[in-house]
Amino acid sequence: LEILKPIWTKIPETASRVRNRIELVLDAAKATGLREGENPARWRGHLDKLLPKRSKVSKVRHHPALPWTEASRFMKELAQQTGLAYRALEMTILTCCRTSEVLGAQWSEIDLKTDTWTIPAERMKADKEHRVPITAQLKSLLEQLPRVDNSPYLFPGQKKGQPLSNMSMLMGLRRMGYSHITVHGFRSTFRDWAGE
């Protein structure tokens, strides 16, 4: 509590991550017999009674998202669209990855033998290598993507040696009539669906 109190209201996002990491370390210590008792960094039933909720400390801004109940219909509509931006959007939704991770995806990261997409640490927000399973639907999408000469990218842009612009998917959403949602909002759509 003494570690978190000074930063809880000043830098709530960082404080929340620090609390989470402390909780994980103490849980691991308990699991390996290095400590006993309750975890003092646990949020539910402990710190939630001692510290204000993050929503009370700072305004959390959510990205406008598609309701999960409309996702199936949207995916069918998306499949009918032509162009790389739509395929990039489809891959973003299928993998729950960030826009930058999908647009920066390179053929060298894709292993269709093991059905794994390995995103290198330097392209991840958390600076850790991330492995994404390639589902049958994603594999089909990847197999249909055109290979552009001398481009390492799955979704090459107009400028030589550059990936597709990060605005391309958002513009695709707008052309489809979905200007009220964002690409990043699909991560929230997935979270809501998984929570049901």
Task: List where the protein language model places each region.
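Active-site/catalytic core of tyrosine-dependent DNA strand-transfer enzymes
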Residues: I11, V25, A65-S72, T114, ...
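General beta-strand recognition
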Residues: L1, T116-T118
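Active-site catalytic microenvironments for nucleophilic, acid-base chemistry
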Residues: P6, A28, T32, R175, ...
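Basic, Lys/Arg- and aromatic-enriched nucleic-acid-binding interface segment
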Residues: P6-E23, A31-A105, K113, M124-K128, ...
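A short, basic/aromatic helix-end/turn motif that makes direct DNA contacts
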Residues: G104-I110, G195-E196
